[in-house]
Regions:
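Mid-to-C-terminal alpha-helical segments outside catalytic/metal-binding sites
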Residues: 1-3, 26-47, 219, 223-230, ...
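Conserved, mostly hydrophobic/aromatic
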Residues: 6, 48, 63, 76, ...
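Divalent metal-dependent hydrolysis catalytic cores, especially in the metallo-beta-lactamase
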Residues: 21-29, 34-57, 73-81, 102-106, ...
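Alpha-helical scaffolding within the catalytic cores
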Residues: 31-36, 58-61, 87-90, 146-147, ...
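Active-site gating/metal-coordination segments in enzymes
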Residues: 58-151, 195-199, 206-207
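Short, electropositive alpha-helical surface patch
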Residues: 58-72, 156-162, 213-222, 244-254
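Catalytic pocket-lining loop regions of alpha/beta-barrel enzymes
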Residues: 116-230, 284-288
Length: 288
């Protein structure tokens, strides 16, 4: 099974994304299953993980409205009001009717509190996620996010955490050593996973190629191993610096150069197992 472990849907005419600015012109519009399907077919991608794009209920409802009718969407990473444990529990009970619910994400980098994820109310909700066997995805952007992720991993050993986009390695800068040290600290916790995704949009040049990705991919494989790494296109965000074909083909080439014997795991098997894409629903996971 080949899995694109990180993609989005949105219709900005229907749901306004707070982070969308004039600089995002190429992706300001409608990006739904019919647009993505040909690219998935061209690369023989069997399943995707659909990920939230905004911190509110309407975005999550919109995702499920689409995902429930699309066979190749294998899992959904939803949004829950983690800062309100009571409402979080109620909302989770509502969303449990959707068989593809597997994970939760909050855009922590948009919060004014730099350590929002460590607030007592949020921690109470994270305990609920662990109890409910939901994955927590983290859009790690700043050094503090790495440190908070490592602390959460130690505090909730039963909670599976996923670092999106490898924590945005500063490709081509003199801060790569700092990034490597931070992500290795997170990877030392066996309940932390990562996605090799979104790397092309961390590069300012339009003429990026596979050589720009090699160092980040090599470090990721060395510290996580292939059984805790996944690959994602980050479509349509990726369109800001490359089309789907270029992004996916370059990721595959990087994996085949660095770890050809592990490419199958990273390109699908790890995501299949972590998100339990073969299970009929989250409620069935772990049933004896």
């Amino acid at each position: 099974m080949i899995v694109d472990a990180h993609q989005h849907f949105w219709d900005t005419g229907r749901i306004q994304l707070p982070w969308m600015t004039a600089d995002h012109g190429a992706i300001n519009g409608i990006f739904e299953p019919a647009t993505l399907a040909p690219s998935l077919a061209a690369h023989r991608i069997d399943r995707t993980v659909l990920v939230q794009a905004a911190n509110f209920d309407s975005d999550t409802d919109y995702m499920f409205e689409l995902a429930d009718d699309v066979a190749w969407v294998g899992a959904v990473t939803a949004w829950l009001p983690l800062a309100d444990p009571g409402r979080c529990r109620e909302r989770l009970a509502e969303l449990d009717r959707h068989s593809k619910l597997r994970a939760v994400r909050h855009l922590i980098h948009d919060e004014p509190d730099p350590h929002w994820i460590m607030q007592p109310e949020v921690l109470e909700s994270l305990a609920l996620l662990a109890e409910s066997r939901l994955i927590l995805e983290l859009p790690v952007v700043f050094p503090r996010h790495f440190r908070d992720t490592a602390e959460l991993a130690g505090r909730f050993p039963e909670l599976r955490l996923v670092i999106d986009h490898l924590g945005k390695p500063p490709i081509g800068s003199d801060r790569m050593d700092e990034w490597e040290a931070l992500i290795r600290t997170c990877a030392s916790h066996q309940n932390v996973y990562a996605k090799i995704s979104g790397l092309n949009t961390t590069i300012s040049r339009a003429d990026w190629d596979v050589n720009d990705l090699i160092d980040s991919v090599t470090i990721a494989i060395d510290c996580f191993g292939p059984d805790r790494l996944m690959c994602g296109s980050d479509w349509p965000m990726s369109l800001l610096n490359g089309d789907y074909d270029r992004v996916w083909e370059t990721l595959v080439e990087a994996l085949e150069r660095v770890a050809p014997d592990s490419a199958a795991l990273i390109l699908g098997e790890t995501a299949r197992d972590l998100y339990e894409l073969d299970a009929p629903s989250r409620r069935a996971i772990g049933a004896g």
